[in-house]
Amino acid sequence: MLNIFSLICICLNSALHSSSFFFAKLPEAYAFFNPIVDFMPVIPVLFFLLALVWQAAVSFR
């Protein structure tokens, strides 16, 4: 249980600290990475949901 709590704290902490970068603009040479960069803050949430579904599949052992 402690591991799940620490994972949630890490995800929330990184999301709060990276919120200032949401409005940053990439240099012109890397403009084609914009869709990937926009999606990157969501990735920790997807890992959390994957862990939740996995635990539900094994009946929260």
Curated annotation (Swiss-Prot):
InterPro entries: PSII_PsbK, PSII_PsbK_sf
Keywords tagged on the record: Chloroplast, Membrane, Photosynthesis, Photosystem II, Plastid, Reaction center, Thylakoid, Transmembrane, Transmembrane helix
GO biological process terms on file: photosynthesis
GO cellular component: chloroplast thylakoid membrane; photosystem II reaction center
SUPFAM superfamilies: Photosystem II reaction center protein K, PsbK
Compartments reported by the entry: Plastid, Chloroplast thylakoid membrane
Transmembrane regions listed in the UniProt entry: 32-52
A UniProt-annotated Pfam family: PsbK
Domain of life assignment: Eukaryota
Family: Belongs to the PsbK family.
Function noted in UniProt: One of the components of the core complex of photosystem II (PSII). PSII is a light-driven water:plastoquinone oxidoreductase that uses light energy to abstract electrons from H(2)O, generating O(2) and a proton gradient subsequently used for ATP formation. It consists of a core antenna complex that captures photons, and an electron transfer chain that converts photonic excitation into a charge separation.
NCBIfam families found in the cross-reference section: PRK02553.1
Protein name per the record: Photosystem II reaction center protein K
Organism annotation: Drimys granadensis
Lineage: Eukaryota, Viridiplantae, Streptophyta, Embryophyta, Tracheophyta
Gene name for this UniProt entry: psbK
